[in-house]
Amino acid sequence: MRASLENGDDHDAHRLVDAGFRPPGRPRAARRRAFARARRGERRARGTAEDRHDVPGAEQPVLRDDAKGARRGGRVDRRAGDRHRRASRREQAGERRRGHAAEEDRHPAREPDRFDGHPVGRRVGEEGGRRRRRGGRERERPGRRVRRLEEFRRGRDVVRLPREGDRRRRRSRDPRRHPGRADSRARARLPRGAREIPEREDRRRAERQAGARERARRHREHDPGAPVAQGRLQRQRRRLDGRAVRDRGVGPRHQAHERRRRAGGDRGDAEAELEVHRDVRAVPARPDSPRDRHRAREEVGRQCAEGDSGRREADRQGQREDVQLVSGPRDEADDMDEASGAARAPDEASEEAMDTILALTGITKRFPGVVALRGIDLRVARGEIHALLGENGAGKSTLMKILCGIHPPDEGVIALDGEPRRFANHHDAIAAGVGIVFQEFSLIPELNAVDNLFLGREWRGRLGLRERARMRRAAADIFARLDVAIDLSAPVRELSVAQQQFVEIGKALSLDARLLILDEPTATLTPAEAAHLFGVMRELKRRGVAMIFISHHLDEIFEVCDRITVLRDGQYVGTTEVARTDVGALVEMMVGRRIEQSFPPKPRLARDAAPVLEVDALQVRENGPVNRFALREGEILGFAGLVGSGRTSSALALIGAKPARVRRMRVRGRPVCLADPAAALAAGIGLLPESRKTQGLIPAFSIRHNIAINNLGKHRRLRWFVDAAAETRTTLELMQRLGVKAPTPHTRVDTLSGGNQQKVVIARWLNHHTRILIFDEPTRGIDIGAKAEIYQLMRELSARGYSIVLISSELPEIVGLCDRVAVFRQGRIEAMLEGEAIEPNTVMTYATSDVRGANHEHA
């Protein structure tokens, strides 16, 4: 055998390689040459000149593997035997195919007609195989036509063989996707009994189409013009994806008939019907281009801004009558203005409608178990300051959150500049030009004012780096317009509450919004700071910016606003102009009743009553002033002054929540050292903080847990367990006593209104039997009705022997509620006013000047 390999006997070498023989001891180069000669002989024995597509006698090229092996310096592939075995199997398959081809030549009549001029040899060749080149190597395998032909001869059900190029067409094989032209290949794969399935589907589809034509014929007999117009209207609505406005209560077809009836004619043609449907806020049929679709949407928005017809017009008429009854009699000049307005030309009316920047129509919002808004309508003109009034829980904040994209409306349309809009999130509202200053701060305490101002929209240069200097200059310009001094490098948590409010306002102004929503912006501002804000608002008004102003201070409403819209219990009450109403009428619209007196009468207190709290020396900061004062039993002592004058700092240092340089005091004649709030709590002193949501309550807890958290040992069972039933009974008693409006004691406290939340904080201290209470801005963010309840509650507590310190920025509260007033200025008590001396002018004089009064007492 070795001799045959050395002599180059290709036939013997081929047999040995097929058997897997690997001759040992042979030089590598000799083995390589022997295997190369064996493979060349195999190719010559397997194929013909025609199959190889070259002329007879031509020398065969060296295979890529052999050439690669030669370049490698004679290294022999160890898997050559496996390759030769595969080659022999391919040769046997070729012999079988050649036998089939010879059988076909002997019986040409058995070839089916459905080949349609595409003989098998066209794809198969004489040997019946397909030649492929992969990696420079010739391979042969049976073609697809040969396999299908073999299946046909074996009796399988083959409808037709695929033609040339079917592999590249990639058509769907599911007849249901193309019912008009079912794929025959998919039907060919079905069993014989299931071939009528596509035909059955075709019959059913034809029956459905016939039924639709019959219904259309019957409908045409009833109303000849309706089917075409109705079909077009449906296509238009589908094309708008639900953006077309539909009138509530009455369908478009009924309105079309009503309009035709009032017009005095019965036009039955399709174009007249389509014209009527266009009046019902449809767009022109089949827009030809995106520009036409854009014009169609503008037309829809313009019609939205002009107002609804039918029931909406009647509702507004009734609301105008209600507002006229509330506002009182009108003079002849008003009647003449109304008559002239009624006689205006249609062009002027349309110009006024186009001046509307915001139109809310039928806004309805439902939450689990409650309907927050019911069909709210609101119109805001360009360059107008529009006030939105209502009690806590009336739906003002919910309506503004819908307008800002925080909550989606369940019903209704929002039209901005005459175009229907639907905001998916708050970023969409900002991009549309809607800015808002929330009642709760949306600032990040760890960032400074500049970063909070441009958070999420930082200015970046060419390399993507933030332009800090440019943003800092812009922030400085914004705060200069607000006329407020803010440290731009300090974190926001180190700023006062009033400064944080100005940062919120500056953040909204930096958006260049065309519609600005201000939700209680003056709640933390002094009158002077509020006056600065009103000046900024008037400047924005002159620039054409529309503003929605939400406030519980009616004097601010009458000072800066143009029109007022009132909500009550989630429903629209009415809209009136500021010049045509008064405070009493607005309060009655908000509350539903007339409030005669806000502040309860002051009792007469004995001047020689024993003090319950005596502060001998209180120095908050180093080298600062030292204050002394006393608090009597059953007295309401007011701390008045501007924001930053030291009122809140003194109160926090009093209970140990803030460090103090000097703190000497006595409680009921006994010296105490209040180093922390726990010591103050043990001494019977409690604080109702300025921000009740972040400092006074745990929002995720229930009413019962918030009330009982200061006194967990009161209802203890078996020393380690809390008696939940006893806590619930105590909570119910306090809720009834203070008038907390909530379904159950287990209601989450963050779902309550501001007034009820403040009552929960008061109930916590009453549960602890604390006799000295410090109220820091107790009526901030509370409507006028809840304010009256808080005032009455404070007076009742003082009548029961509770001593109260009231810190407030509202002069009417200080003057109307306090028995004595300590006026602070720059951390010092400038004056102690009592009795008739408590007047607004006197308080402001001591708060803003360096003059001390003759009645400057500290006891």
From Swiss-Prot:
Enzyme class, first EC level, given as a word: translocase
Biased composition (Basic and acidic residues): 8-17, 44-80, 89-129, 137-167, 193-214, 239-250, 263-281, 288-301, 308-323
Localization per record: Cell inner membrane
Record-listed ATP binding positions: G390, E391, N392, G393, A394, G395, K396, S397
GO molecular-function term, one example from the UniProt record: ATP binding
Recorded catalytic activity of this chain's protein: D-ribose(out) + ATP + H2O = D-ribose(in) + ADP + phosphate + H(+)
Top-rank taxon: Bacteria
Annotated membrane topology: Peripheral membrane protein
Primary localization class, coarse: membrane
Renumbered residue ranges of the record's region Disordered: 1-351
Chain ranges passing through the membrane: none
Family note: Belongs to the ABC transporter superfamily. Ribose importer (TC 3.A.1.2.1) family.
Subunit structure and binding partners: The complex is composed of an ATP-binding protein (RbsA), two transmembrane proteins (RbsC) and a solute-binding protein (RbsB).
Protein name: Ribose import ATP-binding protein RbsA 1
